[in-house]
């Protein structure tokens, strides 16, 4: 959903030319993608989406837009309480940009709790299951807040491993953006619904 992004995070690869040329290419690419999408929407019998905000956007192109709610499959995910010796905060997924998912409040809280001698890295961990690009963003922010010693990074794991990882966690982390009229709209990560389980 291109309109939800604050910038150009929906483009999987950067162009790596001159900055002015990148901006021109991106603007043309966005316009072309939206035109193709909107043309397809106009001829669709029905359109479904998971965001009330997006329903309103898509109704501009097709009056038959339906809202479906996100969730989890109880046959694949059975909540358990597994005790561990550490307090573990877990995040699974991508972090495309700080405009969409921002860990700043978490990192500030960890820094404050460390300063107040409430937590130590040996018993308090934030575990990230992300791609390399996301890890780069997270590392930079963690270092900026002085909380890198609390972080653990892992590659993606098969979907079948996720329920056990979630069940071993003390807290499941859902990141979002701060509300601003110019920021992305309608984002609610599916991780939120996994967390509710």
Give the positions of each predicted feature.
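Acceptor-binding helix/loop patch of EC 2.4 sugar-transfer enzymes
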Residues: 1-35
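A short, active-site helix/loop in glycosyltransferases that binds the activated sugar's phosphate group
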Residues: 34-65, 74
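Acidic donor-binding loop of glycosyltransferase active sites
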Residues: 45, 166-185
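Carbohydrate-associated surface elements
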Residues: 53, 71, 83
């Amino acid at each position: 959903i291109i309109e939800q992004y604050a910038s150009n995070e929906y483009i999987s690869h950067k162009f790596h030319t001159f900055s002015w040329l990148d901006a021109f290419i991106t603007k043309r690419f966005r316009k072309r993608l939206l035109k193709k999408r909107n043309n397809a929407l106009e001829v669709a019998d029905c359109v479904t989406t998971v965001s009330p905000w997006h329903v309103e956007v898509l109704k501009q192109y097709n009056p038959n837009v339906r809202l479906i709610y996100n969730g989890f499959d109880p046959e694949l995910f059975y909540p358990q309480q597994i005790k561990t010796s550490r307090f573990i905060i877990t995040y699974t997924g991508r972090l495309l940009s700080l405009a969409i998912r921002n860990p700043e409040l978490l990192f500030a809280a960890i820094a404050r709790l460390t300063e107040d001698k409430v937590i130590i890295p040996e018993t308090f961990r934030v575990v990230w299951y992300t791609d390399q690009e996301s890890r780069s963003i997270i590392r930079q922010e963690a270092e900026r807040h002085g909380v890198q010693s609390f972080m653990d990074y892992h590659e993606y794991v098969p979907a079948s491993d996720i329920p056990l990882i979630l069940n071993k966690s003390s807290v499941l982390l859902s990141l979002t953006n701060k509300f601003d009229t110019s920021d992305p709209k309608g984002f609610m990560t599916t991780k939120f619904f996994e967390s509710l389980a």
